Amino acid sequence: MRLTVGALLACAALGLCLAVPDKTVKWCAVSEHENTKCISFRDHMKTVLPPDGPRLACVKKTSYPDCIKAISASEADAMTLDGGWVYDAGLTPNNLKPVAAEFYGSVEHPQTYYYAVAVVKKGTDFQLNQLEGKKSCHTGLGRSAGWVIPIGLLFCKLSEPRSPLEKAVSSFFSGSCVPCADPVAFPKLCQLCPGCGCSSTQPFFGYVGAFKCLKDGGGDVAFVKHTTIFEVLPEKADRDQYELLCLDNTRKPVDQYEDCYLARIPSHAVVARKNNGKEDLIWEILKVAQEHFGKGKSKDFQLFSSPLGKDLLFKDSAFGLLRVPPRMDYRLYLGHNYVTAIRNQQEGVCPEGSIDNSPVKWCALSHLERTKCDEWSIISEGKIECESAETTEDCIEKIVNGEADAMTLDGGHAYIAGQCGLVPVMAEYYESSNCAIPSQQGIFPKGYYAVAVVKASDTSITWNNLKGKKSCHTGVDRTAGWNIPMGMLYNRINHCKFDEFFSQGCAPGYEKNSTLCDLCIGPLKCAPNNKEEYNGYTGAFRCLVEKGDVAFVKHQTVLDNTEGKNPAEWAKNLKQEDFELLCPDGTRKPVKDFASCHLAQAPNHVVVSRKEKAARVKAVLTSQETLFGGSDCTGNFCLFKSTTKDLLFRDDTKCFVKLPEGTTPEKYLGAEYMQSVGNMRKCSTSRLLEACTFHKH
């Protein structure tokens, strides 16, 4: 018995010992100097963290790849990486993600990006398109400003074969310094810095090293960030001896970097594991560290200073750190163009050499949409391919990342897509089948009306006494069902607690344990897709018929689901006069009077895509509409007809309006709608919107 008790006590003690590492964040250092700073970081954090709080430990490796592998294997937990390494860290099997971003500028105006620039000596006479045969200085192999961006720009000028990339670059320049390159396999890449040393102890490594290579090492051009020359040469007279190469093959003074840069690059990021990554612990440590050891906070230890070298653990020019939104992975953090540049380089592909006759990958939201899309793909003879996602935001993200190319969105989601960099391509048109006139005139369709519908029998309900009623919505962040009515309510109640304003409701996409999901009935309750029976226009109207007091829909919804137009059991006996509209002035009107009794006019649903894919989407969709846009669907495939309701496109679409080239989301949605959605931003629960606007402080 005594032995058993002793064993239990030992196990308990061991359990306590094993529990401690759960609160320990192991920071990975890539050099002796970094490890020395990390140890100082660790020791100083002990003095400011609570006794029961997180702890910092240091793990020393010899390179960034080794640290990335260590974090992936849980031997370490965090480190700061340049964008090029963030890409590598995000790939399988590493599966790391950004959890915090360095920012520059100031606390009031934080910048989570910097400019990649090409610096040359004043008095030389070549431009960006004349770099072949010159001597180049780079921050490091695979790094953003020093390699990924400049080589991405020069990629199609490299002689074939372009793989391995290092060999092609060796042939392009007469000599280079590319730290971290293989000096045996690619000796010309190490001509200006013998050995190509891959740590901050090497004289030509990193931003300062690349500039030193230009200044003192025989280089003709240095690829660095815009602040490098200001850090190295604080005197304007010294800086005036250098210039920037611009994309339009001109030159500008180094202080005009905002008008003369190669690319805008996301700042360095702290990365952690995607799963079980200790994100909260990491941020708790970084938050406290900034408060006590940030810029100008302490003389004993400074987070953003490197007495033993340069840019140790963090960049010395960083002003602080911001937490990255939880939805943001490495692709959203870096951006599609950046990721594509890396991928093209690694695969040895030159995009300029191909004619865009590729299929358009359409994003489908549910099993029913996927079934219709697959049918479309077959009958289109492969011009359309299909990609699936669970939610509209998942689809938008896939388009942003290049996994899909297009989908149709209502105004609310088109706003989010626009904030993520997508553009409107073609608009649905509901008035007539002659889309030529608005297309030729370059005008946008008028739009539809957002209305509030109630049962005619509930005579006491008005727009002014909706508090405590049961509400039915098409979905969170959708135009008629959410943004417009909730925006109007917000202006009245001045808070975002809509689940306290209504007693119950169904708002697909809202928090599932909320009262605004109480009325939902789908197999995947409150999901923002067709797995929720009350999703969308028809779903919200059905919610009103079966459970609710008010439904927020489009003006055609009642007309499309009454007088026998919808044969479903719940709708087949409904009459138009069974329902009325709530007017904002507190009156009610018949549903046919929507033109004089509506909440607002909404932009028509619109097809969105990435900028570089927009022309192809427009061309394919135009040809597909010619073939399958008619109304004779007997035995034929029709774009604008569905087995249920509004699959891929709205069923009442007559044709597509081609939008003028260069149409931005702001132009299409209109200033009034942009403002109303912008006002709702403080109430937004969209994780994707949060991620896409992170770099737009």
UniProtKB/Swiss-Prot annotation:
SMART domains listed in its UniProt record: TR_FER
InterPro entries with a match to the protein in the record: Serotransferrin_mammal, Transferrin, Transferrin-like_dom, Transferrin_Fe_BS
One Gene Ontology term from the biological process aspect of the record: osteoclast differentiation
Pfam families (alphabetical): Transferrin
One term under GO cellular component: membrane
PANTHER family, alphabetized: SEROTRANSFERRIN (PTHR11485:SF31), TRANSFERRIN (PTHR11485)
Designated name of the protein: Serotransferrin
Protein source organism: Mus musculus
